[in-house]
């Protein structure tokens, strides 16, 4: 009877977890398409100079520069297009990440079309800045319209130059690195005037307000996030932006836009005082970025201002190399402390076997192996409880409705027979956090995107296209259920719920990532084998 209740407990915990996730999604306000001017001016311009940051997106896409005028950069990882007006990155494609499994086209992250405006903007503001919401953007010159990282070349520099009316020369340098998704975006100001220049660099990501393509089984986030010296990582959704503009002073920090598996982020120098800001423009664009330190450039002097921009997958190693907190955009939820070691163990197994499906099987065997002592104790406790059923039935008949005496007698019996009535629950309670943590690892880890297993399972990050594994998982649950003797005293309602549980789980798992179904299926098969082995040992001891 206890084993049946444990299976019910699994089902209730599992369904509760899914309902809780869906409730969080449903309770979030819907994205706002447009904002009034009062929201745009919520931050104090006198304090933060946020009004100096250009906000010319309301005219897009009519103002988009013709494709032939864009500067195209090709590396081993990125295809980047830069608008010479302002030097903004208006297009990025990830060479080694396909748009779809059966499509060789690269995944496009940043783009500027009739449907979406998602770009990375940077510039110089302040008294002598060349980018302004009032004066307009600088029009840069470049030696070529096409740049490529050649074979044997590890670094590619793309310089853009602008000569101001006062004679000062501004060079905006994009530096690309082989094997990397981060781009150095630096400014060099050559003050050829007889007056001191004052400039401040900013970088911001502009994104059309768009609702995340999320579901109960695959909850994902699309929106902004930031980090400061006081807040290591915080999501800041489009709804949050509509409610309140960010204006946080910090040493270092970063600002990012997130979506499933991919991220774009501005990372200013870690030792500089910066301001992380956000806004919603009148054209319905969500903006998040940074304003850096103010630099005074003496006459005849040269000043370099640096920053980094990352545009690519949520690769934890690559993100950590840029900023110690940027890898937190791979959000494992409240069980991150459990998910991180699971992820590292999964990576370790994959490095050995070279197959993510096999790695999931190995991690399942590891988890089941670690929990085996508890599993054995669970089945032993359940066997003892079954042997006590006649005595418990006798007590129930003897004490009738006197629950107090019945409870005291039961506790004395458990103590005498050395039985823990809750002993069967502990392994179940330990399995659920592991299951949920692995669920987030499989959902968030870009390494599993388009990762094949075998036969018809060509992508472990999406559902089984033929629903074979969910059905096998349901069958395995049914077998486990039949191996557990049904107590005659069990409530009829519980019996019905137990009979339907494999069906309910099968339906739920139809839309789960194949990797997660594989974990649960293998776990069930191992549990069946363990159960048969443990029961054989118990029968030798006279416990059935």
UniProtKB/Swiss-Prot annotation:
Entry superkingdom: Bacteria
Bilayer-spanning residue ranges: 6-26, 345-365, 423-443, 460-480, 503-523
Entries under InterPro entries matching the protein: Membr_insert_YidC, Membr_insert_YidC_N, YidC/ALB3/OXA1/COX18, YidC/Oxa/ALB_C, YidC_ALB_C, YidC_periplasmic_sf
Any GO BP: protein transport
Location(s), subcellular: Cell inner membrane
Membrane-protein topology: Multi-pass membrane protein
Pfam family, one: YidC_periplas
GO molecular function per UniProt: membrane insertase activity
Keywords of this entry: Cell inner membrane, Cell membrane, Chaperone, Membrane, Protein transport, Transmembrane, Transmembrane helix, Transport
GO cellular component: plasma membrane
Oligomer and partners: Interacts with the Sec translocase complex via SecD. Specifically interacts with transmembrane segments of nascent integral membrane proteins during membrane integration.
The family this protein is said to belong to: Belongs to the OXA1/ALB3/YidC family. Type 1 subfamily.
Biological role stated in the UniProt entry: Required for the insertion and/or proper folding and/or complex formation of integral membrane proteins into the membrane. Involved in integration of membrane proteins that insert both dependently and independently of the Sec translocase complex, as well as at least some lipoproteins. Aids folding of multispanning membrane proteins.
Name of this protein: Membrane protein insertase YidC
């Amino acid at each position: 009877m206890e084993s049946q209740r444990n299976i019910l407990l699994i089902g209730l915990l599992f369904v509760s977890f899914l309902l809780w996730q869906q409730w969080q999604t449903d309770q979030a306000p819907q994205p706002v398409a447009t904002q009034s001017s009062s929201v745009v001016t919520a931050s104090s311009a006198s304090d933060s100079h946020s009004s100096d940051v250009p906000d010319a997106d309301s005219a897009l896409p009519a103002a988009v520069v013709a494709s032939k005028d864009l500067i195209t950069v090709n590396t081993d990882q990125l295809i980047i297009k830069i608008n010479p007006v302002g030097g903004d990155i208006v297009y990025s494609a990830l060479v080694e990440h396909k748009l779809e499994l059966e499509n060789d086209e690269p995944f496009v992250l940043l783009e500027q079309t009739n449907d979406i405006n998602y770009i990375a903007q940077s510039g110089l503001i302040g008294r002598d800045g060349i980018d302004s919401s009032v004066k307009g953007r600088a029009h840069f010159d470049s030696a070529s319209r096409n740049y490529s990282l050649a074979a044997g070349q590890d670094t590619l520099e793309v310089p853009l130059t602008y000569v101001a009316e006062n004679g000062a020369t501004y060079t905006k340098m994009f530096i690309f690195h082989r094997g990397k998704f981060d781009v150095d975006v630096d400014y060099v100001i050559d003050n050829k005037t007889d007056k001191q220049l004052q400039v401040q660099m900013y970088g911001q990501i502009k994104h059309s307000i768009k609702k995340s393509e999320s579901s109960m089984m695959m909850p994902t986030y699309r929106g902004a996030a930031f980090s400061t010296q006081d807040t290591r990582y915080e999501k800041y959704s489009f709804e949050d932006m509509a409610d309140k503009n960010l204006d946080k002073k910090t040493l270092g920090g970063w600002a990012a836009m997130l979506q499933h598996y991919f991220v774009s982020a501005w990372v200013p120098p870690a030792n500089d005082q910066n301001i992380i800001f956000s806004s919603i423009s009148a054209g319905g664009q969500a903006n998040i970025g940074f304003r850096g330190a103010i630099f005074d450039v003496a006459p005849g002097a040269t000043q370099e201002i640096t920053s980094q921009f990352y545009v690519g997958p949520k690769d934890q190693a690559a993100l950590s190399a840029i900023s110690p907190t940027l890898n937190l955009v791979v959000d494992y939820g409240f069980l991150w402390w459990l998910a991180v070691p699971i992820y590292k163990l999964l990576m370790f197994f994959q490095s050995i076997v070279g197959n993510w499906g096999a790695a999931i099987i190995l991690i399942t065997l590891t988890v089941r192996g670690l929990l085996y002592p508890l599993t054995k104790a669970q089945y032993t406790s359940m066997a003892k409880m079954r042997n006590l059923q006649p005595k418990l039935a006798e007590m129930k008949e003897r004490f009738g409705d006197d629950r107090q005496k019945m409870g005291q007698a039961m506790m004395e019996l458990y103590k005498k027979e050395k039985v823990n009535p809750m002993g069967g629950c502990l392994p179940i309670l330990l399995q659920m956090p592991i299951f949920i943590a692995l669920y987030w690892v499989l959902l968030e880890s870009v390494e599993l995107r388009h990762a094949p297993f075998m036969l018809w399972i060509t992508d472990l990050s999406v559902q089984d296209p033929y629903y074979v594994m969910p059905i096998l998982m349901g069958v395995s649950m049914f077998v486990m259920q039949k191996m557990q003797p049904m107590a005659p005293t069990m409530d009829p309602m519980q019996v019905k719920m137990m009979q339907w549980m494999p069906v309910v789980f099968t339906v739920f798992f139809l839309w789960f990532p194949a990797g997660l179904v594989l974990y649960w299926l293998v776990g069930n098969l191992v549990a069946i084998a363990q159960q048969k082995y443990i029961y054989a040992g118990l029968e030798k001891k006279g416990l059935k």
